[in-house]
Amino acid sequence: MTKKAKRNIVHKRFDSIVKGSQDTKKYRGLELTNGLRVLLVSDSKTRVSAVALDVKVGHLMDPWELPGLAHFCEHMLFLGTAKYPSEREYFKYLAANNGDSNAYTDTDHTNYSFEVRSEKLYGALDRFAQFFLDPQFTESATEREVCAVNCEYLDKVNEDFWRCLQVERSLSKPGHDYSKFAIGNKKTLLEDPRTKGIEPRDVLLDFYKNWYSSDIMTCCIVGKESLDVLESYLGSFKFDAIKNTRKERKIWKDSPFGPDQLAKRIEIVPIQNTGQVSIKFPFPDLNGEFLSQPGDYIAHLIGHEGPGSLLSELKRLGWVISLEADNHTIASGFGVFSVTMDLSTEGLEHVDDVIQLVFNFIGFLKSSGPQKWIHDELAELNAVDFRFDDVKHTMEKASILAECLHPKIRKNFETALKTSHHAFNLPEKNEYIPSKFDQKPREPVKSGYPRLISEDEWIQVWFKQDNEYNSPKQGIMFALTTPLVAKKSKNVVAFKSLDTIIEETYNARLAGLECQFESSSSGVQIRVFGYDEKQSLFAKHLVNRMANFQVNRLCFDISFESLKRTLTNHAFSQPHDLSAHFIDLLVVDNIWSKEQLLAVCDSVTLEDVHGFAIKMLQAFHMELFVHGNSTEKDTLQLSKELSDILKSVAPNSRPLKRDEHNPHRELQLINGHEHVYRHFQKTHDVGCVEVAFQIGVQSTYNNSVNKLLNELIKNPAYTILRTNEALGYNVSTESRLNDGNVYLHVIVQGPESADHVLERIEVFLESAREEIVAMPQEDFDYQVWAMFKENPPTLSQCFSMFWSEIHSRQYNFGRNKEVRGISKRITKEEVINFFDRKIRKGGAERRKLALGLWKK
């Protein structure tokens, strides 16, 4: 065991840290002699360690002559240090130890984080610490990484969210830091400064030396080691030696929205097919009000979706599709409260009326006054979540934003603020808030896997009681197999209207019940996960609403307008999202394109929707899986009640015949052949090349070797294609399991031509093979061990994993155990042979499908 550092590096200690009653982790707070604040978390059960360091400097501190410098500094910091000069060292170490990393630049802080196998925390922390002790910022990397930032800028420049945000910043108070251009690009970081005689690298070095000061840094380390050992690491890697330049955490005392910026109506023409109105109020920074959380209270009431709510009335009038209320601290010292609504076509003709109703509702809340029972209900929900927190690595929770609305508002709506509206009411009490958290009686049959406890021609019932997590939660998965859904594109669209059922689940979602309602070529799936006490009641409500689905004309019109807008806007998605969709269309049987669904939207009537559930239930089969804090008896009772609901709605229905099941199928590509497809998009200035290698039919062996191969080439792909060749900002490799087949994907999104990128991907694959060949046996063996070492999943993950086996009809619940067995036998020669046969150019079993997506 590593001994505690001999020198005294700690200035203050904080041991009385409040935690949830079910939290077994140990915590220690420290302030080092250089002012760095550290939270240590000892979790003896974890297999993955995590570290995050936050520097209180963001893009609001950019020098005016170099917009985007803080973001550029975040990019450059990773590219080598004095102790580890190789630009790949940090990423290579993490990749070899099944780790990952992330970083982002915000308004007033920049965050760096990584995770790694717990046994390798020591080495990862050593490499991580060097970024804040002695980074290189080499000249050779400077221009190359500017290109990477520019690619990131090009990725976002045609997204409506970023366009609107930049308009908001540009129209803020002149000279206020909020008006700066945050992301940066080649023009702001390289071309313009050099035109003015400014060398960007020199300014970058000054920025780092000035702002990367230990007294405005915080760090969290989560590991399986004891608190004393974790503390010793701080001394071993000289965290106390990070320079303290005596910086103060900057606080902006003035809002970027002064009298000249308020009471303004700004109209923006979107790229996507959308209509939205957002009302924003300057808000103070209320991060210190975490005990009362006034901002969350207001957002809860304005954003509520139940009867008597603002959204309910706006929907009744047919003006609004959705509404979100959010309180947000922009940076230390100032924030904003926003009410954002997606408008229907009718709503676009009534924008002023919509705004007036918002102010009416605010006036109603003001006249009603604060309600203690609502505050207590929110506190109760937070207390339950804190007690049974499923998050493995506890980090500092999001701060509470905002307290009160700014008094300076547009005069046109002052009268509305002073009056209420007859349709408004405070929300009803939430019937789904759980109060019982005890464990259900233990079943005499203890099994590590789901058991089939009942089966007939109508339904299969699977059950597994939780014996590992002792959690008051469970999952319910209900699948209704009916081939009618995917038979026609019109049926798929009609089914989509049933998604409005999810809009009625607001209280359940507030109470911690997750809900998903999905259609597929085989039928319908309803997934519910959360606290078990009210879950069966909720599941029965959902199935009953689906079977007896009725919706009024106005709701139908709004729902279908929303659906059409979603289908239309798919064409404006990021190129890498579009390429994934197009590849699925090429290889998966019996699925519909967004264009095909959009084409039939106008032909679907309200009568079609009302009659669809009955038609869907003419012939069907059910599967029910319950996993968690439940009993076999309760599960069988639930299965009976769900069956009774469906059979009562369609008394003349019949069980589905086995040959009527409609599983997904995929095309089998031909060995030795490659197919290249070209497609176009009209929105983004960057394109995407996605290369998919069809490995073959899913099997434990194919899945395992392909997953390992992906891990071996993931880091080289990022380094070679993104960092060295600057082909794009979004570069990744993925091992994917589709419907029956396993694939290896290489994805590059950037400004280069498709032909050039395809050529460079082939060159990269050859380089990646050479790296595997040259990899020392010890490193390969460790990579295999780290890749397949057992890592206990959460209850939710376990539930999803078991359901995947049931729904795919593979029933291999011990697959992970089989994978670990295979991993002990995999050799490097085997992986190289696998690569040569299935990936390498000229391979006997290579099946390559490439898609180039470019701007018209």
Swiss-Prot record:
Source species taxonomy: Eukaryota, Metazoa, Ecdysozoa, Nematoda, Chromadorea
Family: Belongs to the peptidase M16 family.
Gene Ontology BP annotations: peptide catabolic process; proteolysis involved in protein catabolic process
Active site: E74 (proton acceptor)
Name this polypeptide is given: Putative zinc protease C28F5.4
EC number(s) on file: 3.4.24.-
Alphabetical UniProt keywords: Hydrolase, Metal-binding, Metalloprotease, Protease, Zinc
Gene Ontology CC annotations of this record: cytosol; mitochondrion
Domain of life: Eukaryota
Enzyme class, UniProt record, top EC level: hydrolase
Pfam family, one: Peptidase_M16
